[in-house]
Design a protein with these regions (language model features):
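Residues at alpha-helix termini
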Residues: 44, 177, 236, 287-288
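Alpha-helical hydrophobic/aromatic positions enriched in membrane-embedded helices and signal peptides
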Residues: 133-134, 229, 272, 281
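Terminal helices and disordered tails flanking the catalytic cores of nucleotide-processing hydrolases
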Residues: 179, 197-209, 240-332
Length: 332
């Protein structure tokens, strides 16, 4: 059991197989109170032997609106993520909540309960849950903040590229833990793209601008199914950043973004997220009389984006658009 594992002195963990350690960690991450479990592991001093890259987060300070250091923030995101997922399960009753933020969440996103349940029932690997992979990604989402921390002239703390670099670190750990490629890819996407939700939220709150169809299309093109996880992490990240200082306005903006993304993904995917294919590469090459090459893939992607934004809706329009693009490329 985990407890016996703990009883061996921390330094003996080096002798335990990475798979065995991984299984224990994933059991904790996929089970109840993942935040408390990770806090316990940190206090027991086992991270240097299990996941040394996590130790650096402790005590790393951040600017407003953050109220916690990077490690405390990470734990609080795990806690909020657990609560958010629980409040979206089938059979959750609003009476269970006495907290305004959760109430607003279930009001805005409650209609997606069945889709969320199906999302977590999908398997990336027979031995481990999608849920555990999501919590692993949340544990690592800010892992590269310590390494990317800088302070600008105004005294603001910045963490440039911590998302992209964090995805690489988590992916490396995933390989050492012998996770499946599907799991590693899911974890990478969640960490790499975790700032996009915040950009959407602040644009909506600050400029009253909803994400464009192009932005929604690109979000899911890059994230795929991980887009659902990104919405959950985004909401948990916001609560774990502001804590008690979170305003109803910001939370409502975030829930609107969540709703917009999820309804596009789940309720009308053929409109923006995954428009139906109007023609394939061979047909395009025939129509334009061009040989195989990178340009074919680029044109097909540009057509899809045109469909997503509503500019292109028929095969004829797709061909005409491609002719124009090809001309531009040739004269460019």
């Amino acid at each position: 059991s985990t407890r016996e594992l703990m009883k061996q002195s921390a330094s003996d963990l080096g002798r335990v197989s990475p798979e065995r350690l991984r299984d224990e960690i994933f059991k904790m991450l996929g089970g109840p109170k993942p935040d408390a479990c990770m806090r316990a592991l940190e206090m027991l001093g086992v991270f240097p032997y299990l996941m040394p890259e996590l130790s650096a987060m402790k005590g790393v300070t951040q600017s407003e609106p953050h109220i916690y250091d990077v490690w405390e923030h990470t734990l609080s995101v795990l806690g909020y993520l657990e609560a958010i997922i629980a409040s979206l399960r089938i059979g959750y009753s609003a009476e269970e909540t006495n907290d305004m933020f959760t109430g607003l969440l279930t009001l805005r996103l409650g209609r997606f309960r069945e889709q969320f349940t199906a999302h977590f029932a999908n398997s990336l690997n027979t031995d481990r849950s999608v849920r555990a992979a999501l919590f692993f990604a949340a544990l690592y989402h800010d892992v590269q903040k310590p390494a990317t921390r800088s302070v600008d002239e105004a005294g603001r703390v910045r963490f440039f590229d911590h998302d992209v670099k964090g995805a690489e670190v988590a992916s490396q750990r995933g390989r050492e833990f012998n996770l499946s490629n599907d799991e590693i890819e899911r974890i990478e996407k969640i960490i790499k793209h975790h700032m996009r939700f915040h950009f959407f939220t602040s644009r909506l709150e600050g400029d009253k601008q909803e994400p464009s169809r192009k932005a929604i299309y690109r979000f899911f093109r890059d994230a795929g199914e991980a887009g659902v996880d990104l919405v959950l992490v985004g909401l948990a990240d916001l609560r774990g950043t502001r804590g008690p200082a979170l305003t109803q306005e910001t939370w409502t903006a975030a829930l609107d973004i969540a709703r917009i993304l999820l309804e596009n993904y789940w309720e009308r995917p053929q409109e923006t997220v995954a428009p139906p294919r109007l023609l394939d590469g061979n047909e395009l090459m025939r129509e334009l009389n061009i040989p195989p090459g990178r340009i074919v893939g680029q044109l097909l992607e540009a057509i899809r984006e045109g469909q997503a934004t509503g500019k292109i809706s028929t095969r004829e329009e797709a061909v005409a658009f491609s002719r124009e693009e090809l001309k531009k490329a040739e004269t460019g």
